[in-house]
């Protein structure tokens, strides 16, 4: 077994259950998605086919439709209930195509997509980022663009450290360092990747509220090595005592959000008219 594996069926169940109340609980996701969309506006790019990978309830795909009114839009998600929410949100006019599946094995043809837009999804399929990004590269056209956000390694650090003081089991998902993400993009064939980080802080009145908020957005522990069973009152008390608390009695949660983008190499003709793939 790998050092850290994600339980795909558990991820799907988590987001299937979270779909109904997702918009009310996922303020952070909505904020990050909005920022990524704003950054996309600054790029001089006119894609014909756009894939919203990990569409959730459709915030991204609705805005992408406004930004690229002539593009074919595809909303992709692991959870069917999320896609149903997306369909309702998108309305009847120019409804996007809906695809349900695993991002590691996209049901799309080679060189078929101009833009992959993905906000806070990659962390749920991050065991082998080179393989994941290689799959994205497969479906992207030459000169295609990958624009994404994902959680960085310092996400939920307070909760992780508190659990480490309680026992040695896996209670918190592992997130990947920004530099490793950039290296994986290069290894998968993307050129000139650009990476940066934003930090978001949320505060709660108790550790129970912290864990409830994480679960409500579908982001609780989904590692195959995760601790099983219900948490007893004594363990919860130990966790609360180990969790750093401010003088005002507030429990902070850090989210490190990594923003990334990378282009596929262009195809340029030789003098004889033969096209070759340029890797710079």
What positions do the PLM features span?
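A short acidic, Gly/Pro-enriched loop at the edge of an enzyme's catalytic core
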Residues: 104-115
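Conserved catalytic/acceptor-binding region of the Class I
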Residues: 141-209, 216-230
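Conserved alpha-helix/loop element of class I SAM-dependent methyltransferases that forms part
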Residues: 27-48, 63
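Class I SAM-dependent methyltransferase SAM/SAH-binding core
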Residues: 49-106, 131
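C-terminal lobe and adjacent flexible extensions of AdoMet/dcAdoMet transferase-like proteins
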Residues: 209-280
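N-terminal, positively charged/glycine-rich alpha-helical extensions of SAM-dependent methyltransferases
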Residues: 1-21
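A short glycine-rich, Lys/Arg-flanked "PGG" loop and its adjoining helix->strand segment in the class I
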Residues: 130-142
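A short SAM/SAH-binding and catalytic strip from SAM-dependent methyltransferases
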Residues: 114-128
């Amino acid at each position: 077994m790998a050092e850290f594996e994600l339980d795909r069926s558990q991820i799907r169940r988590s987001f299937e259950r979270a779909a109904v109340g997702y918009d009310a609980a996922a303020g952070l996701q909505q904020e990050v998605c909005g920022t990524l969309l704003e950054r996309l506006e600054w790029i001089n790019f006119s894609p014909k086919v756009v894939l919203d990978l990990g569409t959730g309830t459709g915030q991204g795909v609705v805005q992408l439709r406004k930004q690229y009114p002539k593009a074919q839009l595809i909303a992709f998600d692991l959870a069917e209930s999320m896609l149903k929410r997306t369909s309702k949100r998108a309305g009847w006019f120019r409804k996007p195509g809906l695809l349900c599946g695993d991002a590691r094995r996209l049901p799309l043809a080679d060189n078929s997509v101009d833009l992959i837009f993905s906000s806070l999804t990659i962390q749920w399929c991050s065991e082998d980022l080179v393989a994941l990004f290689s799959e994205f590269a497969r479906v992207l056209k030459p000169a295609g663009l990958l624009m994404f956000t994902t959680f960085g390694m310092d996400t939920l650090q307070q909760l992780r450290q508190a659990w480490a003081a309680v026992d040695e089991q896996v209670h918190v998902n592992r997130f990947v360092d920004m530099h490793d993400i950039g290296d994986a993009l290069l290894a998968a064939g993307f050129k000139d990747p650009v990476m940066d980080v934003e930090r978001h802080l949320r505060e709660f009145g108790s550790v129970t509220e912290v864990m409830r908020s994480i679960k409500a957005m579908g982001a609780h522990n989904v590692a195959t090595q995760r601790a099983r069973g219900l948490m007893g009152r004594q363990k919860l008390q130990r966790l609360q005592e180990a969790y750093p608390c401010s003088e005002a009695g507030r429990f902070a949660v850090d989210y490190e959000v990594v923003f990334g983008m990378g282009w596929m190499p262009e195809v340029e003709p030789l003098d004889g008219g033969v096209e070759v793939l340029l890797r710079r």
